[in-house]
Amino acid sequence: MDIKEAGPFPVKKEQFRMTVNGQAWEVAAVPTTHLSDLLRKEFQLTGTKVSCGIGRCGACSILIDGKLANACMTMAYQADGHSITTIEGLQKEELDMCQTAFLEEGGFQCGYCTPGMIIALKALFRETPQPSDKDIEEGLAGNLCRCTGYGGIMRSACRIRRELNGGRRESGF
């Protein structure tokens, strides 16, 4: 029995199974461990950032079964049996389309928000392959950029949309 001290009350660790970036994992954790902590500490996946810790900034954005989620608001027990994708799961041998767009369109400044922004756009474009400018703004509404680099972020999003649209020029950002 693996026990973790949580103040004066011992808390029992439990076994959880999940797929992270295509790899099956079994991990022992306290059920209320934040998924962001599990990803960063147990799996050494530090691309998932933690900033606000209350689900308002989007720095910890991940995909759970392809749906956008905040890792800082998701507990280990909620991830049990699910497929998790982090920013590290997008890159195999070459940069993903979203990552390339951010790189070539200047969609980052300090880079702290970039993983969350890219993950949020992956979720948006999966659900809405040709989003309007308003759809893009709404899709990124849960992600904050401390450097206010929104112009480059929107250019990156529009480039992705354009590439998915066969490269045709469009109005918008």
Swiss-Prot record:
Query: Which Pfam families does the entry mention?
Result: Fer2 (PF00111), Fer2_2 (PF01799)
- Record's note on what induces expression: Expression is very low in excess nitrogen (glutamate plus ammonia) and is induced during limiting-nitrogen conditions (glutamate). Expression decreases when allantoin is added during limiting-nitrogen conditions.
| Gene behind this protein | pucE
The biological processes this protein is annotated with in GO are: hypoxanthine catabolic process
Output this protein's name.
Probable xanthine dehydrogenase subunit E
Name the coenzymes or cofactors required.
[2Fe-2S] cluster
Q: Which reaction does it catalyse?
A: xanthine + NAD(+) + H2O = urate + NADH + H(+); hypoxanthine + NAD(+) + H2O = xanthine + NADH + H(+)
Instruction: Kindly give the InterPro entries that the UniProt entry links to this protein.
Output: 2Fe-2S-bd (IPR002888), 2Fe-2S-bd_dom_sf (IPR036884), 2Fe-2S_ferredoxin-like_sf (IPR036010), 2Fe-2S_ferredoxin-type (IPR001041), 2Fe2S_fd_BS (IPR006058), Beta-grasp_dom_sf (IPR012675), Diverse_Oxidoreductases (IPR051452), Xanthine_dehydrogenase_esu (IPR017611)
Give me the segments passing through the membrane.
none
Q: What does this protein do?
A: Oxidizes hypoxanthine and xanthine to uric acid.
Q: From the UniProt record, give the pathway where this protein acts.
A: Purine metabolism; hypoxanthine degradation; urate from hypoxanthine: step 1/2; Purine metabolism; hypoxanthine degradation; urate from hypoxanthine: step 2/2
Q: Which residues form the 2Fe-2S ferredoxin-type domain?
A: 14-90
In which residues is [2Fe-2S] cluster 1 bound? C52, C57, C60, C72
UniProt: [2Fe-2S] cluster 2 binding residues:
C110, C113, C145, C147
Assembly description: Could be composed of four subunits: PucA, PucC, PucD and PucE.
Any idea which UniProt keywords this protein has? 2Fe-2S, Iron, Iron-sulfur, Metal-binding, NAD, Oxidoreductase, Purine metabolism
Q: Which NCBIfam families match?
A: pucE
Report the EC code(s) recorded for this entry: 1.17.1.4
Quote one Gene Ontology molecular function term. Answer: metal ion binding
First-level EC class: oxidoreductase
Co-factor binding comment: Binds 2 [2Fe-2S] clusters.
